[in-house]
Each structure stands twice: as C-alpha cells, then as structure tokens.
From Swiss-Prot:
It comes from Aethionema cordifolium. GO terms for biological process: proton motive force-driven mitochondrial ATP synthesis. It comes from the Eukaryota. One of its GO terms (molecular function) is ATP hydrolysis activity. The modification Phosphothreonine is found at T6. Pfam families: ATP-synt_ab, ATP-synt_ab_N, ATP-synt_VA_C. This is ATP synthase subunit beta, chloroplastic. The modification Phosphoserine is found at S13. It is a peripheral membrane protein. It catalyses: ATP + H2O + 4 H(+)(in) = ADP + phosphate + 5 H(+)(out). It is found in: Plastid, Chloroplast thylakoid membrane.
C-alpha cells in the first residue's frame, strides 16, 4: 500500500522518466513490446499504450507484463480492448504493478479492473492505493478461531455450515441458481453482518451486475445520499471484457478487501461470482502466451494461479475475510480440473443439483453432496451434529430405495422403509425456502430462519410427530410452525 499525491483522476500519472517501448506484435489481447537494451520492465509491471486510432480518437490501453522474451521484448496482456492499436505505437512502462484505490473511498462505488470508477458518480479519492499482486500473509499471522457464520438458509446452516473467516464455494452448472443464492447470502449476511463487503463480478452477466447494484441501493447497503456510509464496494469485469480484465478483476476486489482487513482491522465479506471465469480467462490467454495446454485444454499453471488468489483470502490476527465464491461446473462435471482445483481450497462446499431444481426445490442445494469442515460435534454441538447426521441418513436411505420404488412401487417396501420415505420427502421439501431476492418471481415473502429454529424443525420431522401432515405443507416455508399452519389450510 502506498500514499499518493492527490490527483483528480486515477489515470493521471507523471510520464517523465519512464521507460518507453514500441508495440512489435499484436495477437488479440496479447501484445509484444520492444524496449531499448537495459530498459526492460519487470514481470507484472503495468504498461500504458497511448496514441490515436485511425479516426483520431484517443487510445489509452493498460497492459500487464507476463513474460520477458529475450531480444529486449516483453509479452503483455491487455486489460481493455485492443482495437485501434497498431505496431510501432509508443508504450510507457509505469515501473510498478497495477495499483487500485483502497479504503473508505471505495465504498458505494463500482470499479473496473484498473480501479477506475464506472458508475458516473465522479472521480474517486486515489491518495491511498495498493498493488494487486501481493504475497499471502505469513503462517504466524494467521488466525485459527473456529466459529459458525449463520446465513438464515436452512439447508446451509444445518448440513454444510459456513465458517467465519473461511472460504465457501457454491458449485453448480448453468441455470441452477448460483447467482440467486449468492445474492440471497449478500442480502442476509451483508445486512446482518454490519461490516463491509466487497463484491467481485468476474466474467458474469452485466445485467446481473446491474440488478445487484439496484438491489443494494434499494436495501440501503449502498447509501446514495452519503456514499461513505455504504457497506459495499463493487468491482466488475463482466463477460464482454477482454480475458486480461477477467483474469485480474478478482485480484482487484481481493486487494480492496485486504485493506479493510489489514489496515482498518475489520471483518470483511468477499463475494466472487464466478471463480470459474477467472480460470477460463487464464486459459484463454495461456495459449497466446505460448504455454502448452494441460488437461482438458486448461493452462498448465492452473493450480499456481488458483493458489496465489485463494491463499490471500484468509483470516489474520487483525481481521478476517470470509469469502463466498460461485463456481460454474462445466457440463455438471465436478471432476473437471477447474472445480476440482477449487475444491482443495474451501472450508465448505454447497453443491447445487439440477435434479432438485427440476423438482422445483429451491435453493437446489444437494444435501448429500454438500460438505463442511465445521460439521463436527465439538464445533456445532451434539444436538446440531446428531440432527444433521440423521437427516443425511434418512435422505441417503431414500436415495437407495428410489430404484426399487421406480420398478415395484411404494407398496412393495417394508413398513419401516415406507415411513423413512415419507419422512425423507418431508425433509426434502422442508429444505426448500422462499428467498428475499426472489420475491418478485415467486410472490412469496422471503424467510430468514435462525439455526435453533432450523434444528427444532428437523428434529420434529425425524421424531415422527409430524407424520400425519401432508408433504406439500413443508414446501417453500420458513420455520416448522409455518408448515403446521399451512397444513391446516390444505
């Protein structure tokens, strides 16, 4: 982190005494730049291409050095579109890595990968900036306290609870509800949490980014009248951006979150949607950088790139970063190298199932595939642990019996198995829940269910006290009292 002299614009910089090079080759988002002997930039240095295109419009493209090629050439990846660039254009070596604004000035604003505001609300105070490339905190700085982060979502809190200061992954294929779930978590946690949040939109739909911004303004998480009182900073590098921007926008968001943790000593929430696009952007430029592709065409540096990002997301003795990341699963294949590499870094995984989404059970969280390192009796307590295990056993038995039911029907099952199936179907429906952010689609008001209420509800179903109620009564309700009230109206 460094303190800069006041400027009115993050793009303003003194270009004297900088090394000057020229573009030698352009292949899509990748540029080769020739520098004079002895004036070579370092890896990760920012380069700025300045000039005019054929229409006389001003060009200002920032790139990041990735490779030193020999013959006084470097290979760099552009952070914005390279249309209008041509060979021979002047390139300025800024002498430092990309740096972005950090601190209270970022709250309530939307930034691009370079830390420039894109919300038409004027310039940002850039006196305090920080480079996007840093080392992870040292081992002795890490904090190892274990505590649960309550989300108000029944299936998550009961079966795969989140760790405060941990890393959580939401895994799912296309269209099963990752972004809706992340928006609900922002709604439930960011409001109740009271601290600051940073949202990194990595290679997702621009419309969803706009929806999220509007939602945050309506809910007061962003205070338009007094931006300093806002609780969130937004960093977007969406689908239409070049791969360089999508590859680095996650680091920009993380750098802003690290400042709140290390300097302001706060607990921070970091939302990333979608971490797969970070990997995808890396694979897009990897071949252009001359690297041999690895498994399924991914970059050979996949584990290194993921590790350098994920290891910085951690809790220190000063403050914590709790990170919730959506992970797109290509073709619903969890063994694909991108989701498989991400798994290794997470404390809890919430796996979304297309089968449950097809049944209309939302959130479509798979209760048997989702896991958490926090689900241990010494952390969550005996009652929570036992209830969660019984719920999983009941659902597992139901899954085993489904083939028999499909061939022979329910009547061929033993009395005990029929009871298990009936309770499992009630549990499956009770794991659904109306969301605040989906009210406009469903027409049902959203529900926040506390952990104690969640455990009480599932214990009642498992005990058999509610065996007489129809299973429809448990569908899309909050706590168990709502289910019993709904049953009287059916």
């Amino acid at each position: 982190m460094r303190i800069n002299p006041t400027t009115s614009d993050p793009g303003v910089s003194i270009l004297e005494n900088k090394n000057l090079g020229r573009i030698a080759q352009i292949i899509g988002p990748v540029l080769d730049v020739a520098f004079p002997p002895g004036k070579m930039p370092n890896i990760y240095n920012a380069l700025v291409v300045k000039g005019r295109d054929t229409l006389g419009q001003e060009i200002n493209v920032t790139c990041e050095v990735q490779q030193l090629l020999g013959n006084n050439r470097v290979r760099a990846v552009a952070m914005s579109a390279t249309e209008g660039l041509k060979r021979g254009m002047d390139v300025v070596d800024m002498g430092t890595p990309l740096s972005v604004p950090v601190g209270g000035a970022t709250l309530g604003r939307i930034f691009n990968v370079l830390g420039e505001p894109v919300d038409n609300l004027g310039p940002v105070d850039t006196r305090t900036t920080s480079p996007i490339h840093k080392s992870a905190p040292a081992f002795i700085q890490l904090d190892t306290k274990l505590s649960i982060f309550e989300t108000g979502i029944k299936v998550v809190d009961l079966l795969a609870p989140y760790r405060r200061g941990g890393k959580i992954g939401l895994f799912g294929g296309a269209g099963v509800g990752k972004t809706v779930l992340i928006m609900e978590l922002i709604n439930n946690i960011a409001k109740a949490h009271g601290g600051v949040s940073v949202f990194g939109g990595v290679g997702e739909r621009t419309r969803e980014g706009n929806d999220l911004y509007m939602e945050m303004k309506e809910s007061g998480v962003i205070n338009e009248q007094n931006l300093a009182e806002s609780k969130v900073a937004l960093v977007y590098g969406q689908m239409n951006e070049p791969p360089g921007a999508r590859m680095r926008v996650g680091l920009t968001a993380l750098t802003m979150a690290e400042y709140f943790r290390d300097v302001n000593e706060q607990d921070v929430l970091l939302f990333i949607d979608n971490i797969f696009r970070f990997v995808q952007a890396g694979s897009e430029v990897s071949a252009l950088l001359g690297r041999m592709p690895s498994a399924v065409g991914y970059q050979p540096t996949l584990s290194t790139e993921m590790g350098s990002l994920q290891e910085r997301i951690t809790s220190t003795k000063k403050g914590s970063i709790t990170s919730i990341q959506a992970v797109y699963v290509p073709a619903d294949d969890l063994t694909d190298p991108a989701p498989a590499t991400t798994f290794a870094h997470l404390d809890a995984t919430t796996v979304l199932s297309r089968g449950l989404a097809a049944k209309g059970i939302y959130p479509a969280v798979d209760p048997l595939d989702s896991t958490s390192t926090m689900l241990q009796p010494r952390i969550v307590g005996e009652e929570h642990y036992e209830t969660a295990q019984q719920v999983k056993q009941t659902l597992q038995r139901y899954k085993e019996l489904q083939d028999i039911i499909a061939i022979l029907g329910l009547d061929e099952l033993s009395e005990e198995d029929r009871l298990t199936v009936a309770r499992a179907r009630k549990i499956e429906r009770f794991l659904s829940q109306p969301f605040f952010v989906a009210e406009v689609f469903t027409g049902s008001p959203g529900k926040y269910v506390g952990l104690a209420e969640t455990i009480r509800g599932f214990k009642l179903i498992l005990s058999g006290e509610l065996d007489s109620l129809p299973e429809q009564a448990f569908y899309l309700v909050g706590n168990i009292d709502e289910a019993t009230a709904k049953a009287t109206n059916l």
